[in-house]
Design a protein with these regions (language model features):
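Positively charged n-region of N-terminal signal peptides that target proteins for export
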Residues: 1-4
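Bacterial N-terminal signal peptides
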Residues: 6-16
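Bacterial Sec-dependent signal peptides at the C-terminal "C-region" and cleavage site
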Residues: 14-24
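A compositional/structural signature for long, glycine/proline-rich flexible linkers
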Residues: 22-382
Length: 382
């Protein structure tokens, strides 16, 4: 597998190896790289997920066993840790693919998220039931369940199933039963898709990523997500879309789940574990499903931070409430047994993402947001 991934990535480099026109200005080149970045990253993840092997397309990635993402599985930045995942990269040139929820449930959040080759959502199906036929091009004369037209031949399906408490055997069993009923079937692609985009000079790429990182740190994540009625370049600026793709590829539309990313504290400063203890106190967010708070290691690319407790998030089931019904989260190095709702952070920079599943209108509109994270106990210099 390691060799096939390397070969596929080498092929990716070759297909994007033509240089940009010399007459293009620096700003034009930055703008073009930003515009095409979501295509590049979606293709890159497709290669990583499948090893560049067409036999791994149109099927669930990996062994399909339910597991929460843990530290060390560093593939997609800011992957959530509060649901089971299934994902598949589909190539529909050779025919449609059918996805199915054969054991549907409405008492536990679950969904099919469908994104195109630009990391733009074209459909989010919450509480799926039965079969859905995904097709590209002409509508098939015969199909199973609901027929869904896909805007690109290459598409990704992400399935999520809520896990309320990984330490509760009954809850885990119920989540696994629902997860096991998520199925996929379709034609075996005859070839792996190719991407043909121009290469860009290093200074252009560096400047584009600097701008993406600045946007991701300062613009609400919901404003970076593309989907129905949120077309990249028209409703969502290309730079915003690229920033959201880099910082949280595969993010769904806010009506499915709204994400609130916090890379700065309430004073506008970057958060570092070496600074001391940080805290956040909030009332329950207005959602119709569930919500969670997860911590990430910013300096390691926005991945989960390894810790002995193997805990990366709290949700509305596992978090302990204060006497007045609010919830206080603590972020620090070396969480102890007496620390309530404590998430361990690295010595360097960290960030926090709150997820609101089936958020109400006040979250979608931005009228309701979390209070800011504050440094509550400074650590003396060492």
């Amino acid at each position: 597998m390691r060799l096939s991934i390397a070969a596929a990535l080498a092929a990716f480099a070759l297909t994007t190896g033509t240089s940009t026109a010399a007459q293009d200005s620096f700003e034009d080149q930055v703008a073009e790289y930003v515009r095409t970045f979501p295509h590049r990253l979606t293709y890159d993840y497709t290669v990583r997920f499948t090893g560049g092997d067409p036999r791994n397309l149109n099927r669930w990635i990996g062994n399909g066993e339910p597991a929460l993402v843990r530290a060390g599985a560093d593939v997609v930045p800011r992957t959530n840790n509060d649901t089971y995942y299934k994902a598949a990269a589909l190539f529909l040139e050779d025919g449609p693919v059918v996805i199915e929820s054969s054991t549907p449930a409405v008492d536990r959040f679950n969904s099919f998220q469908l994104i195109d080759d630009r990391n733009a959502n074209y459909r989010n199906i919450v509480f799926p039931s039965g079969k859905y036929t995904l097709y590209f091009g002409a509508r098939p004369k015969q199909f199973e369940g609901e027929a869904i037209k896909v805007p690109s031949a290459l598409t990704v399906v992400i399935a999520r199933v809520e896990v309320r408490n990984k330490n509760d055997p009954d809850d885990v069993a119920a989540a696994k039963q629902l997860f096991a009923g998520l199925e996929i079937s379709g034609a075996q692609p005859s070839q792996f898709p190719k991407l043909d985009l121009p290469a860009h000079p290093a200074d252009v790429v560096a400047e584009a990523h600097r701008r993406m990182d600045e946007v991701f740190a300062t613009v609400p994540f919901t404003r970076t997500v593309a989907g129905p009625g949120r077309e990249p370049g028209r409703d969502v600026p290309y730079l915003y879309h690229a920033a959201g793709t880099k910082g949280g590829w595969g993010g769904p539309v806010p009506e499915h789940s709204a994400y609130e990313a916090m890379l700065l504290d309430g004073q506008g400063n970057v958060m570092k574990g070496s600074n001391g203890t940080y805290a956040l106190t909030t009332e329950a967010p207005p959602v119709d499903a569930f919500w969670s708070v997860t911590v990430y290691d910013t300096e390691r690319g926005g991945f989960l931070h390894p810790n002995e407790a193997d805990r990366y998030h709290y949700n509305d089931t596992t978090a302990l409430e204060n006497a007045n019904g609010t919830v206080t989260f603590t972020f620090k190095r070396g969480c102890g047994a007496a620390d309530r709702n404590c998430l361990e952070v690295p010595a360097g920079r960290f960030d926090v993402v709150a997820r609101y599943y089936l958020p109400r209108e006040e979250i979608i509109s931005g009228a309701w947001t979390l209070p800011r994270i504050e440094l509550v106990a400074a650590e003396p210099p060492r």
